[in-house]
């Protein structure tokens, strides 16, 4: 079962990152600006000389849109704009949350929004926050790869949602081939990790699924075990 992806129309070599959303790459023998649609640091992926996949971009300040990084043994999706679509596809395909349906995308809750509102088989409501994971160390997928105050707030809001009668979940989409489990990145962002643990203790479900990228799409591999235990 595959989530279809647009095939890249350009390949190149990454040179350097300019800021959070832009970088320089060599494509077709010349240096060009590329748009990076991922707020993470991506230091383990975007290093000088790494092979990249991209699509030509019409309009805007950059010529190309980064879609993936090609490592020795894997392709890694680097496009957070697809995360919600992938999560909705997993639900609608019956791969996860069997019997649930997507009732709404980007539902409002409190002062913000979550990614998905699901309807359960019994008519209940379930809020889902989706996070993409591209960092892997020692076969563990780790999130985040940079401090995220916004992510911590999301966990607090999910906990509040359970108190108001919702089911609530955080779904981590893992895009690393070698990952065999998922853990919060305590060393990078202890505040987020603690907020995730508190949310789980308040009844928020924490799930992680692995997806493998190919040129034509993403393949669902399976669900990963989740370990929220502090390493100290």
UniProtKB/Swiss-Prot annotation:
InterPro entries: SfsA, SfsA_C, SfsA_N. GO terms for molecular function: DNA binding. Belongs to the SfsA family. This is Sugar fermentation stimulation protein homolog.
